[in-house]
From Swiss-Prot:
Taxonomic lineage from the root: Bacteria, Pseudomonadati, Pseudomonadota, Gammaproteobacteria, Alteromonadales
Assembly description: F-type ATPases have 2 components, CF(1) - the catalytic core - and CF(0) - the membrane proton channel. CF(1) has five subunits: alpha(3), beta(3), gamma(1), delta(1), epsilon(1). CF(0) has three main subunits: a(1), b(2) and c(9-12). The alpha and beta chains form an alternating ring which encloses part of the gamma chain. CF(1) is attached to CF(0) by a central stalk formed by the gamma and epsilon chains, while a peripheral stalk is formed by the delta and b chains.
Organism: Shewanella sediminis (strain HAW-EB3)
Record's subcellular location: Cell inner membrane
Gene: atpD
This protein's name: ATP synthase subunit beta
A Pfam family the protein falls into: ATP-synt_ab_N
Binding site for ATP: 148-155
Amino acid sequence: MSTGTVVQVIGAVVDVEFPHDAVPQVYDALEIKSEGLVLEVQQQLGGGVVRTIAMGSSDGLRRGLEVVNSGSPITVPVGEKTLGRIMNVLGEPVDEAGPIGEEDRYVIHREAPSYEDQSSSTELLETGIKVIDLVCPFAKGGKVGLFGGAGVGKTVNMMELINNIAKAHSGLSVFAGVGERTREGNDFYYEMEDSGVLDKVAMVYGQMNEPPGNRLRVALTGLTMAEKFRDEGKDVLFFVDNIYRYTLAGTEVSALLGRMPSAVGYQPTLAEEMGVLQERITSTKTGSITSVQAVYVPADDLTDPSPATTFAHLDATVVLSRNIASLGIYPAVDPLDSTSRQLDPQVVGQEHYDVATGVQTQLQRYKELKDIIAILGMDELSDDDKTTVFRARKIEKYLSQPFFVAEVFTGSPGKYVSLKDTIRGFKGILDGEFDHLPEQAFYMVGSIDEAVEKANKK
């Protein structure tokens, strides 16, 4: 273990000088013992000097402080002992419940599984959320992105997915809070505790008040813990909230290191950094990682380089729309924009595929007719078009659903709808079985039977 001294501090960037024959490698973890601060080597500048990024606050650092090279990248605890615990980027507990007591530690920079070891599955993962199960079904061991601007419900949707899948799936989950609000991490902890699944969830947080180096690495810390469970032959759920903050942290680090920015000010290595993370989130012949990632969309622009780069890695995309949220329809999932590789007759079956495409066709036709209705009114439409509009409005309302995690806000009990009931309900609307019911009966209900019951009460 070689030692060096701090020679320059500029915000989160710390330059350290080492003897010429003991210069640390890129990604090695260095520790300033007196400050309890860990640094990660990013560049070798020559002359024995390395440029590092601080994993914590660099307040109070000064030139001349002694720095010790650990000789390896950052290592974090893995295995059963991490379940039910909240940790930071270094795997240190922050829940005041004593040491982790881990039996093993892994380095956070690891190779992705080789092509021969990878395994893909077409087995569907039922979420209990109608709109997702119908138009963008998830695959076990797949990667899902929840795309949306500010305040359209990404975190609430993710909490509901965790609530529904973690309970029904009864597997292990790892939650990486990347650059999000501390309040959300707090809410998530108590939500898991109330649901009784806390002992099956490992939580890693790097909130938005942390330095950029911390936020850039916290996703890798969470992923390393998920990889350990996968390598033990388990099926694990890996939740990331929010992948955009990971990109943003990379942008900040890139600027601090003096790299030339690329489009919209992002780092020139955006695609590579995203690839390094996403390629590791994969299923092998031993076990599976099913990943759900929230993706913030800046200014609701899906062509922004950050969400656009993320798109390429996903199996299913759930796009949350501000227009749908403004109609009071929650979850505000856009059924015309959301996609899934699993929506194929050979995977989901012919009936599911026909109902899903039928729903999308009706909604697309309604979207086209909206301009005519706005200018000329409903009376100018043909009888067929009028029927399309009435059914599309019912479908639109029926795509809403009360959530378990939103019970405190809405006052309505949450509903879990099985895939079979979802298909039956939408098939009935498309076939005209419920043409006699008012469209309001379909709003914020679970199964179609509840809509019929609601209409009969009136």
